């Protein structure tokens, strides 16, 4: 193990000088003597100097301190010992429950599985959330993105998905909290504990208050743990909240390393950094990784380089809309903007496909008629259009659903709706079976039977 010394500190970026014949490799982990700080080599500047990013706070560091090269990349605990524990980017426990006691550690930088090793599949993953199961069904072993601006419900939707899928799904889950609020991490931990699924979840947190190097690598730490479960032949769920913060950490690091920014100030390596992470999240012949990723959309602009780069990697996109949230319809999923590669009659069957497309047609037509209604009023519409508008408003309300994780806010018990009931309900509304019911009966209910019961009380 060679040692060097700190020659320059600029925020989270630290330059370390080593003897020229023992310069550490890129991505090697370095330990600062007398401090708890770990550094990761990013660049070799020549003359034995390497530029590194700190994985923790750089307070108290000064020039001249000794630094030791560990000779390998950052490695983290993997395997069953990580379940039920909260760890940081280096795999250290932060839940005050003693050492992890792992049997194996793995480096966080791993190659993506080769094309020959990858496996595809068309099995659907039922979420119990009507709007998602209907218009943007998830594939087992697929990648899903939850896109939304500030405060439209990405984290609540993700927590509901975790609750529904992890409770119904017997496998393991890994949750990576990348640059999100510590409060949310705390809520999430207690939610898992109360649902009795904590012993099947490994939690990795690198929150907003951490330096950029930490937030940039914490997603890889979580992914490395998920890969181990997959390689053992399990079907794993990987939840990442939030991919945008991963990109933003890369932007901060890139600027500190002195790279020229590209479009909108993002790092020039944006697409490559996203690819390095996303290409590893895949299913192999051994097991599958199904990932759900929350993606913050800056200023509600889906064409921003960060969400736009993420789109390319996903199998299903769930777009949360501020307009729908403002109507009080939660989950605020936009059924016209959200898409899935599984929405194909050969995969989901004709009945599901026709119902989903029928719902989208009615909502799209209602959207077009809104301008006429605003100017001339409902009376100017033809009878057929009046009927369509009435059904569209019922569909819009029936797309809402009370969540288990939001019971404390809404006061109404959560509902899990099977795919069969979802298709039957929407198909009935489209056919006109429920034209006699008031639209309010469809708001915040589970299955169509509950809407019929609610109508009797109105």
Swiss-Prot record:
GO function term, MF aspect, one: proton-transporting ATP synthase activity, rotational mechanism
Q: Which residues of this UniProt protein bind ATP?
A: 148-155
Q: Tell me which UniProt keywords the record has, alphabetically.
A: ATP synthesis, ATP-binding, Cell inner membrane, Cell membrane, CF(1), Hydrogen ion transport, Ion transport, Membrane, Nucleotide-binding, Translocase, Transport
The record's subcellular locations are:
Cell inner membrane
- Show the catalytic activity: ATP + H2O + 4 H(+)(in) = ADP + phosphate + 5 H(+)(out)
Q: Coiled coil: which residue ranges?
A: none
- Metal-binding as UniProt keyword: no
Query: What is the top-level taxon of the source organism?
Result: Bacteria
Using the UniProt record, name the top-level EC class of this enzyme in a single word. Answer: translocase
* Record's bilayer topology term: Peripheral membrane protein
Q: What is its EC number?
A: 7.1.2.2
Q: Which GO terms describe its cellular component?
A: plasma membrane; proton-transporting ATP synthase complex
InterPro entries in the record: AAA+_ATPase, ATP-synt_VA_C, ATP_synth_F1_bsu, ATPase_a/bsu_AS, ATPase_alpha/beta_chains, ATPase_F1/V1/A1_a/bsu_N, ATPase_F1/V1/A1_a/bsu_N_sf, ATPase_F1/V1/A1_a/bsu_nucl-bd
Q: How does it assemble?
A: F-type ATPases have 2 components, CF(1) - the catalytic core - and CF(0) - the membrane proton channel. CF(1) has five subunits: alpha(3), beta(3), gamma(1), delta(1), epsilon(1). CF(0) has three main subunits: a(1), b(2) and c(9-12). The alpha and beta chains form an alternating ring which encloses part of the gamma chain. CF(1) is attached to CF(0) by a central stalk formed by the gamma and epsilon chains, while a peripheral stalk is formed by the delta and b chains.
NCBIfam families, per this entry? atpD
Q: Which family does it belong to?
A: Belongs to the ATPase alpha/beta chains family.
| Job description of the protein | Produces ATP from ADP in the presence of a proton gradient across the membrane. The catalytic sites are hosted primarily by the beta subunits.
Q: What is this protein called?
A: ATP synthase subunit beta
Source species: Pseudomonas putida (strain ATCC 47054 / DSM 6125 / CFBP 8728 / NCIMB 11950 / KT2440)
Q: Which gene encodes it?
A: atpD
């Amino acid at each position: 193990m060679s040692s060097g010394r700190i020659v320059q500190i600029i925020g989270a970026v630290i330059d370390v000088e080593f003897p020229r014949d023992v310069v550490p490799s890129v991505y090697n982990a370095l330990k600062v003597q007398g401090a708890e700080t770990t550094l990761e080599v990013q660049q070799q500047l020549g003359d034995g100097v390497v530029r590194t990013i700190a994985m923790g706070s750089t307070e108290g560091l000064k020039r001249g301190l000794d630094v030791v090269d560990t000779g390998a990349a950052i490695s983290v605990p993997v395997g069953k010992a990580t379940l039920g524990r909260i760890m940081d980017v280096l795999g250290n426990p932060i839940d005050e429950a003693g050492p992890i006691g792992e049997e194996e550690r793995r480096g966080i930088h791993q190659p993506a599985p080769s094309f020959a090793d990858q496996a595809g599949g068309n099995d659907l993953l039922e979420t119990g959330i009507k709007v998602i199961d209907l218009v943007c069904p998830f594939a087992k072993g697929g990648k899903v993105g939850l896109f939304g601006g500030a405060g439209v419900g990405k984290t609540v939707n993700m927590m509901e998905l975790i609750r529904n899928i992890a409770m119904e799904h017997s496998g393991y889950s890994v949750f990576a909290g990348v640059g999100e609020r510590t409060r949310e991490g705390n809520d999430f931990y207690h939610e898992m504990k109360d649902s009795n699924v904590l012993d099947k979840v490994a939690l990795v947190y690198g929150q907003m208050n951490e330096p950029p190097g930490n937030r940039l690598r914490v997603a890889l730490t979580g992914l490395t743990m998920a890969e181990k479960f997959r390689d053992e032949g399990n079907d794993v769920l990987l939840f990442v909240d939030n991919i945008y913060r991963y990109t933003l950490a890369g932007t901060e690091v890139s600027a500190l390393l002195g790279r020229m920014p590209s479009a909108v100030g993002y790092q020039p390596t944006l697409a490559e950094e996203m690819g390095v992470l996303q290409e590893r999240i895949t299913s192999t012949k051994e097991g599958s990784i199904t990932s759900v990723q929350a993606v913050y959309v800056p200023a509600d602009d889906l064409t921003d380089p960060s969400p736009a780069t993420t789109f390319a990697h996903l199998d299903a996109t769930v777009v949360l809309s501020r307009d729908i949230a403002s109507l009080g319809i939660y989950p605020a999923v936009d059924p016209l903007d959200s898409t899935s590669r599984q929405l194909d009659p050969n995969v989901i069957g004709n009945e599901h496909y026709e119902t989903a497309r029928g719902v989208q047609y009615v909502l799209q037509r209602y959207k077009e008629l809104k301008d006429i209604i605003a100017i001339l009023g409902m009376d100017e519409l033809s009878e057929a259009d009046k009927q369509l508008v009435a059904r569209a408003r019922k569909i819009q309300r029936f797309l809402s659903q009370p969540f288990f994780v939001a019971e404390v806010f809404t006061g109404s018990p959560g509902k899990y709706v099977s795919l069969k009931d979802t298709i039957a309900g929407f198909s009935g509304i489209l056919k006109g079976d429920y034209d006699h019911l008031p639209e309010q009966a469809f708001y915040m209910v589970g299955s169509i039977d509950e809407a019929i019961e609610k109508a009797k009380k109105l």
